[in-house]
Amino acid sequence: MGAAPCASKVRLRVRADQVESVTLRIWWNNAEYRWFMRRVEGGFYEYEMSIPEQPGLLWYYFIAKDKEGNTWYLGNANDGMGGEGVVTRSEPPAFQVTVYDPAYRTPEWMRDGLMMQIMVDRFNNAGGTDMKNLPRGSYYHAHWDDDPALVINDKRGSNSANDFFGGNLKGIEEKLDYIRSMGVTVLYFNPIFEANSNHKYNTGDYMKIDPSFGTEQDFKELCAAAKKKGIRIILDGVFSHTGSDSVYFDRYGNYGGKGAYCDPQSPYRSWYNFNDWPDNYESWWGFNTLPNVNEEDPSYKKFIITGRNSVLAHWMRAGAGGWRLDVADELPMDFLRALRKREKGIDPDSALIGEVWEDPTKKMAYGELRCYCTGDTVDAVMNYPLREAVLDFMRCRINARDFVRRVESMRENQPKQFFYSQMNLLGSHDRPRALAVLADVGNMEPERKYRYPIELDKKDYDHGKRRLIAAWNLICALPGMPCIYYGDEAGLYAMSDPYCRGTYPWGREDQELLEAFRACDKRRMKSHALRTGDMRLTAVGEDVVLVERSIRGGKDVFGKAAANEHRAVAVNRSGESRWIEYGGKIVEIAGESALILK
């Protein structure tokens, strides 16, 4: 049954010939209910169920008794992915119903948009570099095309992350025409606030742009220039922890000694949990450079969310069009709800995207089953499950039927407005470059100390490139907001962090790959059907996935007026040609490619 709005009515029907009775077993809010189903014509049993009035997850399956007194169950498949039920003699997994707020809305521009993720330091430099803007102990690379440095600096295997290349906000503004030429309408930046690392996930001051990136005025000017070109800017909000080298913690005394580590009377003392002040404190995954914050602390909540000039409000007034929330599944649900309420109060058309790596409809975090698509937290998440499905399919780890099943499970369990707003990515700063993965030359995510700059020969590069183009066509044919990780479109390939965070190869781009991305992006942006049309997903044999998108009756899936249209894309993951029947004809799809069908 999938997702349903609160307080709606749903009629459940099950065909069960030659049984005496069928019972519907339901779980809601830690309570169990059983209802006898009514027998109707055709051997069916049915029950009209009232969906609860509050958002959450509802679970159910059917219990049948035959004339001999035997008990049979009809429930979810063992993989829990929904679809057609399975009959068993033992208790099965339950079907899921995602109960969501009927007032749930996501911005239209998300489902219509195309995103690019950019690490500011690695994209483009404008105006040169100045050593005085670098954090203490950091350095600039001598050459833009150097590999990022890997210096393991502790027993946990973390990277020192103190090497910089000089990318800045003015550098991004300088390249807005290029960005727009790729069809991009949304830019997501990794953190840009002051911090002593190149990745900036250890915030030093939430109210300041990092000096190596520019100034607040530079940010405002970038937002204004981007807006003129139809591009919105999303910021990275790191709110589960701060840096130890920060205004708020100040372990090293670099910020005046008023932080929680230095001063027991610090105004920030209640933000942190000390087991034995000052050296023994809770930190993110045990990294003492990332002290955890208590998100429910009133003063912290006021500083980040509710205050008149909170972090959230300040940067949205400066031009940000929304936020991507770092480790969203580690933030308390009430914190997320408060954040959503304030953000939408400032700008109802802003976006809130969560970093959730697993199924966002039922993520188990800290002993709590959480659902992020009921309308009270985020608009969408980074769609890592789709990334895994696409890459697994293209590398022959799963077949076409498996791929279709994974995507249909997402569609079934997610509200439509969430499903069509998902951030659909192939690469990110936390994963190896997609081309490297698709080249299939070995493990691209070994333990950090075993990572190194790889060199692909022409054969392996071309193999990964063919697969990448096909994979990107598949991403752009599916509902959701496609996201380019900067440089993927230009031919960058690398192992995971830090090498996946290399610089954009200006002047060394793979022009053929660029044009393939650009053509795909433009095709999507010109087609209502590819953005908000209905979807039919078909597995054709083991190797071909056929995606059909259509608008009928003059309206898209959200009821918005749109011209009738039908688009189809077939992707063949095999290394050899495959033939499919389409439109009454037999058509050939070359190996490891996508075919645009008319």
Give a label for each model feature:
Residues 121, 366-367, 423-456, 472-510:
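Aromatic/acidic polysaccharide-binding cleft in carbohydrate-active enzymes
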Residues 1-112, 116-117:
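Glycan-association/targeting regions that enable binding to alpha-glucans and other polysaccharides
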Residues 118, 179, 189, 206, ...:
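Conserved, mostly hydrophobic/aromatic
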Residues 120-186, 192-318, 339-346, 362:
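Substrate-binding/active-site clefts of carbohydrate-active enzymes
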Residues 114-116, 187-189, 233-235, 323, ...:
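Hydrophobic faces of well-ordered beta-strands that scaffold small-molecule active sites
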Residues 223-232, 240-241, 246-257, 311, ...:
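Active-site-proximal helices and loops of the catalytic beta/alpha 8
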Residues 11, 537-583:
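Carbohydrate-binding surface patches
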Residues 16, 587-598:
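C-terminal beta-strand-rich structural cap/linker in extracellular carbohydrate-active enzymes
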